[in-house]
């Protein structure tokens, strides 16, 4: 018993003597249930901290086009790749989770990637909708500007935070509809992700356990609209559907996939002429989770395995590197105030052009 107490005290002292660890816990409001949990979390933090420092040293020497930083994910996952099942462009999982300062996180404590993946609730969802010929209309071969940023046109709402809920698909869907609604009406309305989380199960979505942007669009079309965020605020959990027709913020007629699939030139024409586009990406890499700024170039990122839905709001070039400007749903304390510049014209890196989709209003 005395030995156990002595060991526990040594662990507590060791973690307390790490100023970076103590600062990390303070900044992100981290709380742990036990000393053993804190020791494991501290180990993961140290691994990620070494990875970030090593990468940034190489980036400073010009070996990488982006930098990383420690953030709210740094005590949850290791540097190793997640395991994800192979999925096709017409059948993909788009879910991920986020962590906010001060949240009680003891119930999602993972020491291995397998435990983490199970905790995220990853699953394969099967499409139920029949393909409409209109979905696959080829993008017209038109000339577009070299640089596009729909934020400057007023077509993009503020960065949001999905919290402890695998609802990135809902944020991606609302983002593209917000843009199309603005371009048609001139009014930017923040739409309700919670409406989609709670009410689109019959279409095939799984709320906080994952979903599809296309099925979100089908729900909105069949439902006759989607509520505003103000009227139906986000709760980051599955709740009973309480859609209110008097709070309708936008609607749509159909949706279309950017075709040909996997074609970055087609996606560029879509983003350049249509507006913000919902896209699916591989976000499993530790480098993505710890992204800070610069053009994210990760050769190991899969072009065919997707687990995260985001919003392409523009594109351009920086210091000779082409990029996609992407809005994430992990809050403004991640990346470039919630955004990331992802490599463009790098063989469809991270699968960004594999299954892009947008609503028709």
Show which residues each predicted segment covers.
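Catalytic-core signature of thiol
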Residues: 2-361
């Amino acid at each position: 018993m005395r030995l156990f107490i002595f060991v526990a005290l040594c662990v507590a002292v060791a973690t307390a003597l790490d100023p970076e660890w103590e600062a990390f816990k303070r900044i992100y409001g981290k709380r742990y249930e036990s000393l053993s949990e804190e020791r494991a979390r501290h180990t993961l933090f140290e691994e990620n901290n070494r990875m970030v420092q090593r990468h940034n040293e190489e980036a400073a020497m010009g070996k990488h086009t982006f930098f990383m930083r420690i953030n709210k994910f740094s005590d949850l996952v290791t540097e190793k790749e997640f395991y994800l099942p192979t999925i096709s462009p017409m059948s993909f999982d788009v879910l991920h989770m986020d962590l906010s300062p001060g949240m009680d996180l003891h119930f999602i404590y993972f020491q291995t990637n397998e435990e983490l993946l199970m905790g995220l609730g990853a699953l394969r969802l099967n499409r139920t909708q029949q393909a409409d010929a209109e979905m696959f209309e080829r993008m017209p071969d038109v000339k577009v500007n070299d640089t596009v940023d729909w934020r400057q046109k007023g077509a993009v709402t503020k960065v949001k935070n999905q919290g402890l809920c695998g609802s990135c698909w809902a944020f991606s869907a609302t983002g593209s509809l917000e843009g199309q609604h603005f371009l048609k009406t001139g009014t930017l309305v923040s739409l309700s992700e919670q409406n989609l989380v709670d009410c689109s199960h019959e279409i095939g979505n799984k709320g906080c356990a994952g979903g599809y942007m296309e099925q979100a669009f089908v729900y909105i079309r069949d439902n006759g609209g989607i509520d505003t965020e103000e009227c139906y605020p986000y709760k980051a959990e599955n709740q009973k559907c309480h859609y209110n027709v008097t709070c309708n913020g936008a609607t749509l007629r159909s949706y279309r996939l950017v075709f040909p699939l996997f074609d970055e030139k087609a996606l560029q024409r879509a983003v350049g002429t249509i507006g913000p586009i919902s896209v699916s990406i591989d976000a499993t890499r530790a480098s993505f989770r710890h992204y800070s700024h610069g053009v994210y170039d990760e050769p190991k990122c899969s072009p065919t395995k997707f687990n995260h839905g985001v919003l392409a709001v523009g594109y351009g070039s920086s210091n000779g590197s082409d990029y996609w400007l992407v809005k994430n749903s992990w809050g403004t304390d991640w990346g470039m105030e919630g955004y990331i510049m992802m490599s463009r014209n790098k063989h469809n890196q991270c699968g960004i052009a594999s299954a892009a989709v947008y609503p028709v209003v």
